[in-house]
Design a protein with these regions (language model features):
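N-terminal secretory signal peptides that target proteins for export/translocation
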Residues: 1-14
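Bacterial N-terminal signal peptides
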Residues: 12, 17-29
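Pocket-lining segment of extracytoplasmic ligand-binding domains
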Residues: 98-99, 172-173, 177-265
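Conserved C-terminal helix/tail region of periplasmic/extracytoplasmic solute-binding proteins
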Residues: 301-324
Length: 324
């Protein structure tokens, strides 16, 4: 027996066709949006404004509105972060004065975007409390631990110069902070040049005495850095990042105890100790002015003169221009 198939009226097919078409358009637009979405890769360290910015999540909405997503990568210190920036693995990050100079000597990639005010009390030369070393001049012939190419490298250079010594008069021992602290505590080195919060943690440990901090020797600026190509192509995104950092700075300046509690788990240092470090920190992101640019050039020229970097570098030529 044959079964007769009833014809479906064209009028009843139209709604289904419209739904299918709408779904197709939605999927196409979604795929197109994801294809157009760009990524800002931000390098951060365990301590500082950028890790606060990451934790608060306030940057993501600002950049999403411009078609960007944010990818965060943690680094143990400034030098490897700058290496990643030179290699094109990071678009934005922060470091002290010395790491960008070593990076510039290696490649003409880096751009200075902004800086925080000077914080000379945030780094120091430490000796054991029982040490016979009473002045920087007493470091002659001693082993001094430091992170090569970091901010404290310049502090050591300036401090021994002021004491009438040269690098040849001491034995630098290049170690990352954790290894340097271990060497310091077991007496394998005579002094340790270090920055906050490791400086504050060593003080709190009870066996460290401050031989000299950066006061009168170095400014100890914190710089925000990018690549020249990223600056040229992503000006509005950089402006959004700087604005987000400024917001976090404004909050952190008046809430150091709250900041300490927020950072403590990631840094692995108790909040009360972090509070000491944070009170030595400065806040207020701003563009590089002529004075800061000249001081950074002075640091670069010093390292070149000591043959610690292989060539001269041009700081002013790497500074982001207003409106770019």
């Amino acid at each position: 027996m044959l079964t007769r198939t009833r014809a479906v009226p064209a009028s009843s097919l139209l709604p289904r066709l419209w739904l299918a078409l709408a779904a197709l358009i939605f999927v196409s637009l979604t795929l197109a949006a994801h294809a157009q979405e760009r990524t800002v890769r931000i390098g951060y360290q365990k301590y500082g404004t950028l890790v606060l910015l990451k934790g608060r999540g306030s940057l993501e909405p600002k950049l999403k509105a411009q078609g960007y997503r944010v990818q965060w990568s943690e680094f143990p210190s400034g030098p490897p972060l700058m290496e990643a920036l030179n290699a094109g693995a990071v678009d934005f990050g922060s470091a002290g004065e010395t790491p960008p100079i070593f990076a510039q000597a290696a490649s003409d990639v880096l751009a200075y975007v902004a800086h925080e005010p000077a914080a000379p009390k945030g780094e120091a030369i430490l000796v054991p409390k029982s040490s016979a070393v009473q002045s920087v001049a007493d470091l002659r012939g001693k082993k001094v631990a430091l992170n090569k190419g970091s901010n404290v490298h310049y502090l050591l250079v300036r401090a021994i110069e002021a004491a009438g010594l040269t690098l040849a008069d001491i034995t630098p021992v290049y170690l990352a902070p954790a290894d340097a602290r271990a060497a310091f505590e077991r007496g394998a080195v005579d002094a340790w040049v270090i920055w906050d919060p490791y400086f504050a943690a060593a003080e709190a440990g009870g066996n460290a005495r401050v031989l000299a901090d950066g006061t009168g020797l170095v400014p100890n600026h914190q710089f925000y850095l990018s690549s020249k190509s990223f600056v040229a192509e992503n000006g509005p995104a950089l402006d959004a990042i700087v604005a987000a950092v400024a917001e976090v700075d404004a909050w952190a300046k008046d809430n150091t105890d709250a900041v300490a509690k927020e950072l403590s788990p990631s840094v692995g240092i108790p909040a009360p100790i972090l509070s000491i470090a944070l009170k030595r920190q400065t806040y207020g992101i701003r563009p590089l002015d002529e004075a800061v640019t000249k001081e950074q050039q002075r640091i670069a020229d010093t390292f070149h003169g000591l043959k610690l970097v292989p060539k001269t570098v041009d700081i002013a030529g790497a500074v982001r221009k207003p409106g770019s």
